[in-house]
Swiss-Prot record:
This is Zinc finger protein 334. It comes from Homo sapiens (Human). PROSITE patterns: KRAB (PS50805), ZINC_FINGER_C2H2_1 (PS00028), ZINC_FINGER_C2H2_2 (PS50157). Belongs to the krueppel C2H2-type zinc-finger protein family. One of its GO terms (cellular component) is nucleus. It comes from the Eukaryota.
Amino acid sequence: MKMKKFQIPVSFQDLTVNFTQEEWQQLDPAQRLLYRDVMLENYSNLVSVGYHVSKPDVIFKLEQGEEPWIVEEFSNQNYPDIDDALEKNKEIQDKHLTQTVFFSNKTLITERENVFGKTLNLGMNSVPSRKMPYKCNPGGNSLKTNSEVIVAKKSKENRKIPDGYSGFGKHEKSHLGMKKYRYNPMRKASNQNENLILHQNIQILKQPFDYNKCGKTFFKRAILITQKGRQTERKPNECNECRKTFSKRSTLIVHQRIHTGEKPYVCSDCRKTFRVKTSLTRHRRIHTGERPYECSECRKTFIDKSALIVHQKIHGGEKSYECNECGKTFFRKSALAEHFRSHTGEKPYECKECGNAFSKKSYLVVHQRTHRGEKPNECKECGKTFFCQSALTAHQRIHTGEKPYECSECEKTFFCQSALNVHRRSHTGEKPYECSQCGKFLCTKSALIAHQITHRGKKSYECNECGKFFCHKSTLTIHQRTHTGEKHGVFNKCGRISIVKSNCSQCKRMNTKENLYECSEHGHAVSKNSHLIVHQRTIWERPYECNECGRTYCRKSALTHHQRTHTGQRPYECNECGKTFCQKFSFVEHQRTHTGEKPYECNECGKSFCHKSAFRVHRRIHTGEKPYECNQCGKTYRRLWTLTEHQKIHTGEKPYECNKCEKTFRHKSNFLLHQKSHKE
């Protein structure tokens, strides 16, 4: 039987579900992705059945990855109820701006399957003759038209209906007890599929829908319809590699690139490749400097919106993700996952070159540059290159003199956070690195590696000149300069000649740095205000007192060093001989006995010294200075210990006593000579 054709106007606006910004923010990422798929699929289906019009703004925004919310919220006042809509049906057809699409009854039902999220199981062969009544399963009532069959089927799938929704047929309302709209016998058109489409397309919903099968809540009916269709239908696009299925073939194609390794989008600047175009677009902003997302609080800009959202949590103080092990909180879930690996020891990122594993992907990326020899981060001041940006940033502070990291204990400042963290261990006594051979704990990993070499009992690095062996190559390099006479710098102000380049740089900074702060009492000038405060304490106050002996100090670091004499703590260990020291400067001076370094050279006679104190005393020979005077006889001396020994003559003190013959001595040297006489 030939069916009568009728026309209905269908525009994309009829199928569009709009969100305000507030509503959009309430959707989780899965719901947003679902909305995107629904809208793009509806638009594609309309185009496939002959819909021709310029691309709507919402589709353009979705394709560009932008948020599709509208400025003003729609209300039900923009849409008439079902009776008014039917009365104005002809007027809508006449004034509609979009192209009219013609359907037969059979084609209409089939196309509605595609347009409305594939929720109906009625195909072309599923449409019976008009002579045969249709049966609705829930109540067993007979229905006379296709429209009531379609409505009844939808009612069966979703029985929880918001009060504000009016897009239902008369028969479905009889099941649900809804009598909001009266049935008018004069309007026979209400039993046609035309009215069904109009019923469903002109509604706007304020209340969310609950879907009984999966428990999800949706704010718009179009999303609910598609969700039901996805749970009841098999996805035809399946990946042959991992059997994962996708609702769209384009999504499957992008997914398969993970297995094939295909990256068709190439950056014209650095030739880096990407699987999807959006990743390339985001990457290109690194080269162009474009940072379109700006923080309204601090005006900081970002390349992508996700980085901005994470940053904004800093201003709000919100740290939503807490570690169950240590209670530490994080702004991002990914940061928590990375942190948790520090508890589990998991290192999922492995280098294919050497097998070294890392807990973070960024660490692996930086490590791989060591194999390629790639150092992309270059200092504009000196041309030195680095593997990672953070190392370059720390290096640039050498040129600027900036030391933003300050120790709260001793006010010492550092170029980078890691150096400060290592320094703090000298105050806390923390030694997190344990030697597996002897169980000894050390402050830094580098110190542990250097210590483990001593267990091998082998000094691998030999000096070609004198045959001396060293455990470390760096120590050998410093030692060899004693033979070559290589000296990195001479500065007349201090008279120091440095064999170690780092020491030379330190001395240079000390001598050339501009002095900004001057002491009003002595005229002593220093480069930092904190140094001036410490200097003034030597005159007026000594606020730091030792609890053991009551001795006072003007600096907290000096007190810390002194307290080690009571605790016996000696944190500085020589890698060559294993000797330990309380203070770092003593440790540094001791190392020169192994390297042979003598950085302090006299300008008068050319004699050089390991220790600065010895050099200072030697200089007094040329200047004739004797600052230490005896109060008893007025005799003067160049060294303090010489004065101390001399004063024993006036006091009669003889502190050194022989255990064999009980003879006493004023000087230790004489006492040692005497003891040898007993051994002989």
